[in-house]
A protein has these predicted regions:
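Glycine-rich loop at the start of a catalytic domain that most often binds anionic cofactors/ligands
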Residues: 17-24
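Conserved beta-loop-beta/alpha segment of the NTase-like Rossmann-fold superfamily
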Residues: 26-29, 36-129, 170
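Membrane helical hairpin/interfacial module
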Residues: 9-13, 26-30
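Short acidic/polar active-site loop segments enriched in Thr and Asp
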Residues: 3-4, 76
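Small/polar loops that bind or transfer phosphate-bearing groups
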Residues: 8-9, 54, 157
Length: 180
């Protein structure tokens, strides 16, 4: 399971660190009001995982943010979860991805189908069908021109990535907008 969380932040994002920090004030207030059950829940949450932060010096894209984590990650596979996608499912998305990783032992992307007319709003995969909910990705197309998308299967902001990505990112030239 996941025991450590690394959050890549940028300039003026101190509130993210504050949000996930231990809340001494809240614990004190709950204790003073005799709300011991809630106090235990709050304390248990703060002990669930260790959270670390690395600041991305410039906003140079997702690839650069992932590359910032290389010394923290080492040589283990890792999960990437982008905060701008909310996934609500009976089986949590990350659990599904971890199960797929255990079976295939390779980088896993979370995907979803989108209406063809909305494909230009997403990164879209060009892939070969393997079995239900499993595709072998040939290519990724970021926000394709309307009508030119290879499929209507969009990349969700959830990934399990192998550490080989760091070698690829190290040699990756910046793309559109200077992003990696």
């Amino acid at each position: 399971g996941i025991e450590e969380i690394l959050i890549i932040t940028g300039k003026n994002k101190k509130s993210i660190e504050d949000h996930f920090d231990k809340s001494v004030e809240l614990e004190l207030e709950l204790e003073q009001k005799g709300k011991t059950e809630l106090l235990e829940i709050v304390r248990d949450i703060s002990q669930m995982v260790n959270i670390y932060y690395i600041r991305q010096k410039e906003p140079k894209g997702l690839g650069d943010a992932i590359y910032c984590a290389r010394s923290f990650i080492g040589d283990e596979p890792f999960a990437v979860m982008l905060g701008d996608d909310i996934v609500d499912n009976d089986v949590p998305c990350l659990k599904q991805l971890m199960s797929a990783y255990e079976e295939y032992r390779t980088t896993i992307l979370g995907v979803q189908t989108v209406a063809p007319e909305d494909a230009n709003k997403y990164g879209i995969i060009n892939a070969r069908y393997i079995e239900d909910n499993v595709y072998k990705v040939k290519d990724l197309v970021e926000k394709p021109e309307p009508g030119k998308q290879p499929s209507n299967i969009a990349i969700l902001g959830r990934y399990i990535i192998t550490p080989e990505i760091f070698e690829i990112l190290e040699n990756q030239a910046p793309g559109k907008g200077g992003e990696v």
